[in-house]
Amino acid sequence: KNARQVFAIETGENGLLFFQDNTPAYIIRRFDIARDGTKIKQEDFASLLGKTSLTHGGSFKYTGSYEDIATCIKRYVAAWQAEMAKFFKLVVFNYLFCNSDAHLKNFSLQQTPDGDYRLSPAYDLLNASLHVKDSDFALEEGLSPNLVKSDVYSRTGHPCKEDFETFGKLIGLNEVQVQKALHSFTGSDEQVKQLISNSYLDERSKRMYLRTYEERVSRFNRKN
């Protein structure tokens, strides 16, 4: 809900329904099936990067960096800058909302009716800290092994806004694109809090969700 309603990130259409015994069920419309029932070609980035359990071990989907995904986008997407801006925004979102399970198989390219490729709608967006011990990033090499870290990152071990600015430019975005994406995350705290408050999470999970989000925002905005 936060991704789609607050930050205008394209996601699969989804909803929550309840059975007669009040057991909840999360449903999502498949976005790899066209309205006429035909299959839409889609590949995740583990496949596009040639990574499997045979080539990279059991944790293959957690290997590499987000720069690897960006490089792959440039390789397969003709209008890559527009899709790169979407990808960059999604990386920032995952960091702010503690989605430390944003691995290679949770990003995909999808073929359009014209035969070219675009990022698929975002999926598996969750606050992983509610379920497991959290880390900043799912991928072992983080944003990029080539990232020149800010003083804050070097000192604290956690990236801040300056590091995402550097990463955005590293993957080929210009200053305007980077700042537009980052600006979209400012001034939305009240909307986020309201959505968390109105969610079907239990009260303990709501408090934890809000606390972890506020901690990430604080890290993100840290300058010293």
What are these language model-derived features?
Residues 1-104, 108-224:
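Anionic ligand-binding catalytic core segments
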